[in-house]
């Protein structure tokens, strides 16, 4: 039996550069991963079987057509797998939950059976975030997010607080709103430097269109800003927001304050990998 965490992905910066002819967008982003997320448990079986449990298991559109099931059918191997997916991350939340699940599944199959030589191509076909989620290490992503570059990670161990309104926000409408409301304007490349420098100087170009679609996101950011974090921002296309702290005690104090004043909001704590 193998247990893997599907680490929550956050974008410490996300610059949208242009829309491509194929409909996808050229982006530059700083991927980071939290040491918490969904949990997958796998064991050998005669045939593939996927069981979903956890707080958000019932909101999966089709638990048998999610990225875990698709990963299992994509990677060749001998024998089946019985996989239990504990869905702790909200869906359509900007945390790469499905991609993180797929990344964990790649790591499980690598340990049990090994991966094919073309595994990266298979990962890309499953989703733009999947290659980054397989490694689950801080990296710069370019293109659609699949072209990964190393970055000096001087943020490992920082305390993280994730907060979500419990409102799903699909990626497609946010990118469309970016083109409509921002006119698709390129506001410039990702800064250079260490992870801290990029995160501090960077931006999330999808935050304005996401807030236009879901205005309460601004309330989450305001609540997080009031806890005096090192930085706070929306992750990906939203609606999850994150705050980073140099001290665990500050994060825990912030989490208690958020829970007290906004008991209906979802939250998760962890540290950056």
From Swiss-Prot:
EC number, as in UniProt: 2.7.1.148
Classification via InterPro entries: GHMP_kinase_C_dom, GHMP_kinase_C_sf, GHMP_kinase_N_dom, IspE, Ribosomal_Su5_D2-typ_SF, Ribsml_uS5_D2-typ_fold_subgr
Annotated GO MF terms: 4-(cytidine 5'-diphospho)-2-C-methyl-D-erythritol kinase activity; ATP binding
Pathway: Isoprenoid biosynthesis; isopentenyl diphosphate biosynthesis via DXP pathway; isopentenyl diphosphate from 1-deoxy-D-xylulose 5-phosphate: step 3/6
Residues the record marks as active site: 9, 129
Reactions catalysed, as given in the entry: 4-CDP-2-C-methyl-D-erythritol + ATP = 4-CDP-2-C-methyl-D-erythritol 2-phosphate + ADP + H(+)
Keywords: ATP-binding, Isoprene biosynthesis, Kinase, Nucleotide-binding, Transferase
Record-linked SUPFAM superfamilies: GHMP Kinase, C-terminal domain, Ribosomal protein S5 domain 2-like
Example GO biological process: isopentenyl diphosphate biosynthetic process, methylerythritol 4-phosphate pathway
Protein residues bound to ATP: 90-100
Tree of life domain: Bacteria
Pfam families per the UniProt record, alphabetical: GHMP_kinases_C, GHMP_kinases_N
Known role: Catalyzes the phosphorylation of the position 2 hydroxy group of 4-diphosphocytidyl-2C-methyl-D-erythritol.
PANTHER family: 4-DIPHOSPHOCYTIDYL-2-C-METHYL-D-ERYTHRITOL KINASE, CHLOROPLASTIC (PTHR43527:SF2)
Family listed: Belongs to the GHMP kinase family. IspE subfamily.
Name of the protein described by the UniProt record: 4-diphosphocytidyl-2-C-methyl-D-erythritol kinase
Gene assigned in the entry: ispE
